[in-house]
Each structure stands twice: as C-alpha cells, then as structure tokens.
C-alpha cells in the first residue's frame, strides 16, 4: 500500500499514523487467534451481536536493556535475517526453575462481536460451484465504486486519480514566465513537488445487494448415543461456523437442519445447536430425510444444493451399504456433498463408514474431512468451501 507524506505546513495529527499501525497489529493478532477462539463452546449458537473478549499480547516498543555483566558480546556470522535471535542464556519465563524478577509479558483484552469475527474469517470465501438456475432469489452483498471523495481510508485510495490531482495543482501553480514553482519547499528543492492532503482522492463505495442464484444448504448431524459431549461440541462448532458464513455472505440462502439417530427429523436452529439425544445410529436415515426434503421442496433444476454431514462414523454395520447408496444419490443432486468425521484425539485409524465412502463414492463433488480437535474446525470448513481446490479429483481431506 502506498504511503504519501504530507509536506504542507498545515497542522497535522501526528499520532494518526501510530494509531493506524497499532490498529493493524491488533487486527493481525486477532486473526492469528481466531481459529481457536471461534470454536469456544461459550459462543456456539449465540447472537451475532454478542461480544466476546479476545486476549492480545501487548505491543512493546524497542528498547535497550542491561546485559548479564559477562565478558563477550553476542555475534553473528553475517547470514542473519530480520527477527533472528542470537543464542544466549536461558530467559526467565514459564516452566520449572527458580523464580525470576523480570517484567512479565503484557496481555490485555479487546472486545469484538461474533459478526466481526465471522467477517475476519470468511471475507474472501464463497459457496463453491454455484451455478445459474431457472429461478433467482439469492442475494449476495457486493460493493461498487461511485466516483471519488476527498476523505477516506487508505485501502480505498485512488492512486491514479491522486496523481492526476497533483499534476493539475502543479500546472496551476507554475509561473507563466519562467515556470518556477511558487509552492516548492526549500527542504526538497524546486525540482521536488510533493503530495499534500488536498491531492488525495478516495473511492466512494456503495453497498449493493447483487441478485444471485438459488442455494440451499442441508446440515445433517449425528446426535446418537455414541456422539458424546466432546463430539457433539465439535460438530456444532462446524455447523455454527457454516451457518454464520451463510448469514454473512448470502441474504436469502435456505438452511435446513436435520438431526438423526436411527431415525431422522427436520429441526429448527435452536434444537439443532442445543438439543441432545441418545440411541443407535443409522446414517442412511439422515441421507434419506435429506433426499426427501430435496424432492419435495428443492428441485435440482432450480436450486444449488449443498449437503454436509457430521458423525463419529460409528454406524450400525448392516446400514453401511444403504448409507453408501444414499450418499451416492445425494452426490447426484448436490453441487457439493461433504462428510466430516468427528474423532477426538490424535490416534485415528478411520471408521468403516468413512472407508466405505472413500472406496465406493466416485463422484467428484464428494469430500471427506477429519476433525480431531477444535482447532481443526475452521481449516476443515475452509477446505470444503475453497473454490480454488482441485475439482478434478475426489478428495479425502485431513
């Protein structure tokens, strides 16, 4: 991003650049920690206006400190890069050992709404392979430029227009006789004609609700007895992120919630995120319910259909064949069908049903992912929604 130095003699807020830099560092810190923050159980199913607190490490100024009063100094071999640290004595900090007397690391909290968190996460993502259908009801938020203005934020700086305004000012300020600049600054010499604030132009942006194509997302979740609290929490985290993404990016997308044990039923948003059940598992029941809803309300001719299923893979063995058949039928009518297997822990040999899916589902629009811990939720969802992913291969993402 270009930075223009204002060389005018008009009084200026000198702390503005410091505030801008501080804000960038804070936002960068938030983005780095969002993956684990968004999966916290305390915010699952909450309102988008609910505020959450995010811990951020203090941003310290560079300073000189006293050494250890030992002979010699730290030295490098000439191949160091910015940010490298010289080896030295172990520092005081967390862990075993004697107490230290150095200053601790400053940590403070900032408040941010769930909606702002979601915007950070999914700003550059969209539903994959969305195609034009006969009916158009889906609205997508977009922005278009409507001319220029004198004030604005740095990302909206119109560089070419700003240069044109500077040239116009320069031409207008020349003396008609010898062309000497009236406004040149002695510090730079008369050959230099710097930018001033009056030269800068910014794009005027207007939010526009772009009319797009029909889309429905079917969220299928296993709520059987084998899905303990940890597994259900991970599954709900996945669907919570998916649901918030859809609310952010699309105005009229339909979302259908399906919960299943040995039988399946359509539920509302609150029941889906907060209600638990028990019993056995027939994965095919969830798929058959989804196919039933599609046939009754969402014709593939008119709708872009996306189906996602989360389960621990502990399916009744006699149901595996039927589950594979139903999954293949879903692939035939869906733009994308994603299966997420919830297996907490690091030791995972893969379930029977997942192996059945990978071996017997040949559709290119099928993808399988693993979610082992809460930090896996966001990367797993992004892999499913990544439009740039290879569409020519059936993927088993991990």
From Swiss-Prot:
Transmembrane segments: none annotated. Residues 11-22, 78-95 have a biased composition (Basic and acidic residues). Gene3D superfamilies: von Willebrand factor, type A domain. Residues 1-22, 68-104 are annotated as: Disordered. SUPFAM superfamilies: vWA-like (SSF53300). InterPro entries: Spore_YhbH, UPF0229, vWFA_dom_sf. It holds the Pfam family DUF444. Belongs to the UPF0229 family. This is UPF0229 protein Ccel_0490. It comes from Ruminiclostridium cellulolyticum (strain ATCC 35319 / DSM 5812 / JCM 6584 / H10) (Clostridium cellulolyticum).
């Amino acid at each position: 991003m270009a930075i223009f130095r204002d060389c005018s003699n008009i009084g200026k807020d000198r702390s503005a650049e410091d505030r801008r830099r501080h804000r960038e560092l804070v936002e960068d810190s938030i983005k780095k920690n969002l993956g684990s923050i968004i999966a916290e159980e305390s915010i699952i199913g909450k309102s988008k206006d609910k505020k959450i607190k995010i811990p951020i490490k203090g941003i310290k100024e560079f300073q000189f400190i006293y050494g250890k009063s030992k002979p010699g100094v730290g030295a490098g071999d000439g191949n160091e890069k910015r940010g490298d640290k010289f080896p030295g004595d172990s520092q005081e900090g967390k862990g075993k050992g004697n107490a230290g007397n150095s200053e601790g690391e400053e940590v403070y909290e900032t408040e941010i709404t769930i909606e702002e968190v979601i915007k950070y996460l999914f700003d550059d993502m969209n539903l994959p392979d969305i195609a034009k259908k006969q009916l158009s009801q889906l609205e997508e938020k977009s922005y278009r430029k409507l001319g220029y203005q004198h004030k604005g934020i740095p990302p909206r700086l119109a560089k070419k227009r700003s240069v044109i305004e500077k040239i116009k000012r320069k031409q207008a300020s020349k003396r008609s006789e010898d062309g000497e600049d009236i406004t040149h600054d002695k510090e730079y010499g008369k050959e230099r004609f710097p930018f001033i604030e009056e030269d800068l132009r910014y794009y005027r942006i207007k939010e526009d609700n772009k009319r797009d194509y029909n889309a429905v997302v079917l969220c299928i979740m296993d709520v059987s007895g084998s899905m303990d609290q940890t597994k259900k929490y991970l599954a709900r985290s996945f669907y919570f992120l998916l649901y918030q993404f859809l609310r952010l990016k699309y105005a009229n997308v339909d979302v259908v919630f399906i919960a299943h044990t040995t039988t399946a039923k359509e539920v509302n948003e609150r029941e889906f995120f907060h209600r638990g059940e028990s019993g056995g598992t027939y994965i095919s029941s969830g798929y058959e319910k989804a196919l039933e809803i599609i046939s009754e309300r969402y014709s593939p001719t008119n709708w872009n259909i996306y189906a996602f299923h989360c389960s621990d893979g502990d399916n009744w063995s006699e149901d595996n064949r039927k589950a594979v058949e139903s999954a293949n039928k879903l692939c035939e009518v869906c733009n994308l069908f994603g299966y997420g297997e919830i297996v907490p822990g690091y030791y995972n040999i893969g379930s029977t049903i997942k192996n059945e899916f990978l071996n017997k589902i040949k559709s290119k629009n099928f993808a399988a992912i693993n979610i082992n811990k809460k930090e896996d939720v966001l990367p797993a969802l992004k892999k499913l929604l990544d439009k740039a992913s290879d569409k020519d291969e059936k993927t088993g993402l991990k």
